[in-house]
Amino acid sequence: LEAYRRGALAERSLTAFDAESGRKLWTRPGNYQTRPIIVGRTIFAEPWFFDLAGGAAKTGPQGKPLELFRGSGCGGFAASAGTAFFRAGAICYRPFDAAGRIAPLVSGQRPSCWISFVPAGGIVVAPEGSAGCTCPYAIQGSVALYPKDLPAETPRPADK
């Protein structure tokens, strides 16, 4: 994380355009690692968060920039409204709030090297992505996670 704080990837920038006219709205240095994603009115570009409307860095309760740095792992991020899903040694997640910690969803299972999570409607689906990989992970299989209190009208995986 210190390398990013020093500007290790300062040549990477973020630019926003008006969708109707194509006019450039703003541009700023990004200094980010992976492809940015947009969640609501926020751009997340590992390890930073930026305001979509003006490009300003988002800050936490103490006025410090919000950060989410996974430490290791390749591949992109996927996100729901409040949580990032990514590869960091296993299938991991972290709430976007400043106090959230990175936690494994499923230990021993490796997602693919590319974006391989689908968080939508309260459900997270992670298709198998390690077959043929040289990384040593024990579990090869797809995962679908949903809360116990999912409303009855929501489609569920078939009961066996």
Model-assigned labels for residue ranges:
Residues 94:
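Catalytic-site beta-strand/loop segments enriched in glycine and acidic/polar residues
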Residues 13-32, 54-75, 97-109, 113, ...:
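Aromatic (tryptophan-biased) beta-strands that constitute blades/sheets of beta-rich domains
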